[in-house]
């Protein structure tokens, strides 16, 4: 799930933190990819009849098709991926997982009903909601990656947290995931849409945490508190507290402790804190997650030459993939993994830290930009209201 409405808040309050670009802009970089999130996205890439891709024997192959060809596209563009798989979820996440299971069970029933009486759109919608990543999906993807010569890591718990460790240590340029909570785990850079298909034509979004904090004028603790208030995998949001209210509460009070105190002491009782809302434990999971240090032997990864015959045996003989396509893809993989060894020029230079004066100038420019955005928003809203109030047919 990630963090509800966080990207919207960043867009509105720290637009300079987000850079949209093409996949080729990341040539020569190493990237840690949240495997489970990627596999989930491959599984929901269904056919028009609402069914997943399958082999002749009826086995699901969407996850393997996605992992093989999307990884190939990443390597074709000179990027060296390392995939990170989820371990056991933290205990605090069990409530969220139970809710997801219930939603999927309800969706499965609705899917069956839609197949009987619903439209094609309804069948596809409910089919997507029933999808979940199984242990078998993970194991088959690991087998495939090994045959491709692409490294992977098993995280003790959350994959995003382990990706963040690798990014902070400089072992990879960025963490890649659709989950915005990767920023809560202190990943300096988050890439979104990296494993999307080329047909979707979505730009790769590069989000810089330091610019997010600068734009929001918060330290990391306040940022994590904001994310908890917005609603995360560990806790639901406080009822009736939307994104703008959450941002205002953190800005006004500075911490969740103060926010909770203010809500409880409010005579109007505008908001109600849920009875079981362990925000301190949630915060601790973001600040001290169960991860392996970057110098741990399990985090020592390298890229190998693909096992072409192994790929043919697994994908062609066992999963009924096209042999010509698999052999051609393996040849591209072998060639491009070597090409990706080339270093980017930026790797030879260390960034120069900004002076306090430069920081102040940037902050002022950012505040001016925000004011202009607010002013434009007000003017647009006013123009819409005026247009609505005019009788039809008048100019």
Swiss-Prot record:
Keyword Metal-binding recorded: yes
Lineage, top ranks: Eukaryota, Fungi, Dikarya, Ascomycota, Pezizomycotina
Signal peptide range: none
Entry comment on modification after translation: Phosphorylated. Phosphorylation upon DNA damage induces relocalization to the nuclear plasma.
Protein name: Flap endonuclease 1
Cofactor(s) the protein needs: Mg(2+)
Cross-referenced PANTHER family: FLAP ENDONUCLEASE 1, FLAP ENDONUCLEASE FAMILY MEMBER
Interaction with PCNA: annotated span: 341-349
Family: Belongs to the XPG/RAD2 endonuclease family. FEN1 subfamily.
Region spans: I-domain: 122-253
GO BP annotation list: base-excision repair; DNA replication, removal of RNA primer
Organism per entry: Ajellomyces capsulatus (strain H143)
InterPro entries with a match to the protein in the record: 5-3_exonuclease_C_sf, Flap_endonuc, HhH2, PIN-like_dom_sf, XPG-I_dom, XPG/Rad2, XPG_CS, XPG_DNA_repair_N
Binding site for DNA: 47, 70, 158, 231, 233
Quaternary assembly: Interacts with PCNA. Three molecules of FEN1 bind to one PCNA trimer with each molecule binding to one PCNA monomer. PCNA stimulates the nuclease activity without altering cleavage specificity.
Residues holding Mg(2+) 1: 34, 86, 158, 160
Annotated spans, Disordered: 360-395
Binding site for Mg(2+) 2: 179, 181, 233
Cellular component, GO annotation: mitochondrion; nucleolus; nucleoplasm
Basic and acidic residues compositional bias, start-end: 360-389
GO molecular function: 5'-3' exonuclease activity; 5'-flap endonuclease activity; DNA binding; magnesium ion binding
Enzyme Commission number: 3.1.-.-
